[in-house]
Amino acid sequence: MRKIIHVDMDAFYASVEQRDNPELRGRPVAVGSAAARGVVAAASYEAREFGVRSAMPSVTAARRCPDLIFVPPRFDVYKAVSQQIRAIFAEYTRLIEPLSLDEAYLDVTENLKGMEIATEIASEIRERIKQITGLNASAGISYNKFLAKMASDLNKPNGQAVITPKNGPAFVEQLAVKKFHGVGPATAEKMHRFGIETGADLKSKSLQFLAEHFGKSGAYFYGIARGIDERQVRPDRIRKSVGAEDTFSVDINDLDLATAELRPLAEKVWHHCEAQRVSGKTVTVKVKYSDFTQATRSRTSALPVNGIQEILEAASALLATVYPFRRSVRLLGVTLSSLTNDQEAEDEEQPQLDLAL
């Protein structure tokens, strides 16, 4: 039986800001821009009590919480803290699969400490994180990745929960499918149209039905409905793509305004790449219009991109190719694909460096 831990930092960006600035402690904080077209990147738990959430337009957030304090993001600091946390994980296991700067899967079945009880390992890791970074973490412990992820949400903030093989299937059956990890809003809505509201409803559907209506994801849904998830914790896992998108509160017609909206998307994409230690060669821009039609444009370079500015420059050039817009723009997206890990990127760059010398 595997022992999987999912560690998730509590309100990570906002908590770092409250840690570093005592005046922010106990107050509603949003990491992001207060500008009219700004977006909340993260919200403290004090802000969440007013309904403030990440990805929410700043105007909406300020309306819900008039005393909300906006703090500009410091991604270099968040990355440094994330590396401290990653080092703590490495004291316990080599099987670490980071999902972002603030969460990761750990397989502690065979761990470096020789500890047998996964809940004790999770508790010790959380204590170490608190001692070294001053931040709180929550954790979920189970026998597979899906249930560990679900468990980490049960006792947030600053808590942990375990889902055992005995209670796993029953837990899944009562869970609303919209809360399933891997089921986004569009998929949940599609499931609802088929009368699938809970895990029990999902379990009642055959593998053939799920494959027919949900494609490759059908087999995954069939398994997790039964508490089964065979995915391994993979330290070397490379995602096929990393993307970010934003739906605007007011549609855009102006190219300069639209181009300005690309920067936060490029920043988000690159910071996810840094967390995964990957880069990519193909930049894609998605433009969704007010009538819900969309256009995509891509550009592939010989070498992986190296930083926010390179993503932004490519995305801006691609966006310009669909201007004048045929309708006003309601959503923009930026995706980086053809991903490689850092070592592969260095190997590709080395021949050019040799030639230059």
UniProtKB/Swiss-Prot annotation:
Top EC class of this enzyme: transferase
Which family is annotated? Belongs to the DNA polymerase type-Y family.
Q: Where does Mg(2+) bind?
A: D8, D102
Q: Where is the active site?
A: E103
Protein name (Swiss-Prot/TrEMBL)? DNA polymerase IV 2
- Name the source organism: Agrobacterium fabrum (strain C58 / ATCC 33970)
- Output the PROSITE patterns linked to this UniProt entry: UMUC
Q: How does it assemble?
A: Monomer.
Primary role: Poorly processive, error-prone DNA polymerase involved in untargeted mutagenesis. Copies undamaged DNA at stalled replication forks, which arise in vivo from mismatched or misaligned primer ends. These misaligned primers can be extended by PolIV. Exhibits no 3'-5' exonuclease (proofreading) activity. May be involved in translesional synthesis, in conjunction with the beta clamp from PolIII.
Give its localization: Cytoplasm
Q: Which cofactor does it need?
A: Mg(2+)
Alphabetically ordered keywords of this record: Cytoplasm, DNA damage, DNA repair, DNA replication, DNA-binding, DNA-directed DNA polymerase, Magnesium, Metal-binding, Mutator protein, Nucleotidyltransferase, Plasmid, Transferase
Q: Which Gene3D superfamilies match?
A: 3.30.70.270, 3.40.1170.60, 5' to 3' exonuclease, C-terminal subdomain, DNA polymerase, Y-family, little finger domain
Primary location class? cytoplasm
The protein's site described by Substrate discrimination is found at: Y13
Catalytic activity entry:
DNA(n) + a 2'-deoxyribonucleoside 5'-triphosphate = DNA(n+1) + diphosphate
What gene, per UniProt, encodes this protein?
A: dinB2
